[in-house]
Amino acid sequence: MAKLAVIRIRGRVNVKRPVRDTLAMLRLHRVNHCVIVDDTPSYLGMLQKAKDYITWGEINAETLAKLIRKRGRLIGNKPVTDEYVKEKLGMTIEEFAQKVVNGEMSLKDLPNLKPVFRLHPPRGGFRGSKKRSFKEGGALGYRGEKINELIERML
């Protein structure tokens, strides 16, 4: 089971109620926030409902490790460190990220980790309109493995 990275692209003005509720269930309350979800039919249905406000794709272990190391926060807004992960789980951030991507562990297995990653806007911009789908040269919707490039630019 793959893990999907979901990033909110568009803001909250004129969002229809069902879409707003779906974004709230995904914990995507603000622009440039990212969450990691499972590749299950229920989540895929939620992503399809909110596809005009988000982008998503399969995240790899290397990008997830960078995301946790650079943007991961613990309760109290403390950064996630190698020492903390080693103390709680007995492994490095890279090993933890690999197990999360493979489905052996979940992000919830790391105690006190906040589920939302707050990212910067991408360096170089979104390379097109924020209002069109990725297939049409925009920024929205499913983008597959290219989500890793976008996350790298947003770290």
Swiss-Prot record:
Cellular component terms per the entry's GO annotation: cytosolic large ribosomal subunit
Organism lineage string: Archaea, Methanobacteriati, Methanobacteriota, Thermococci, Thermococcales
Species in which this protein is naturally found: Pyrococcus furiosus (strain ATCC 43587 / DSM 3638 / JCM 8422 / Vc1)
Domain of life: Archaea
InterPro entries, alphabetized: Ribo_uL30_ferredoxin-like_sf (IPR036919), Ribosomal_uL30 (IPR039699), Ribosomal_uL30_arc (IPR005997), Ribosomal_uL30_CS (IPR018038), Ribosomal_uL30_euk_arc (IPR035808), Ribosomal_uL30_ferredoxin-like (IPR016082)
Keywords linked to the UniProt accession: Ribonucleoprotein, Ribosomal protein
Positions of disulphide bridges: none
Any Pfam family matching the protein: Ribosomal_L30
Record-level Gene Ontology MF annotations: RNA binding; structural constituent of ribosome
Family that this chain belongs to: Belongs to the universal ribosomal protein uL30 family.
Statement: the UniProt record of this protein carries the keyword Acyltransferase: no
Protein's recorded name: Large ribosomal subunit protein uL30
Mitochondrion listed as a keyword: no
GO biological process, one term: maturation of LSU-rRNA from tricistronic rRNA transcript (SSU-rRNA, 5.8S rRNA, LSU-rRNA)
Annotated CDD domains: Ribosomal_L7_archeal_euk (cd01657)
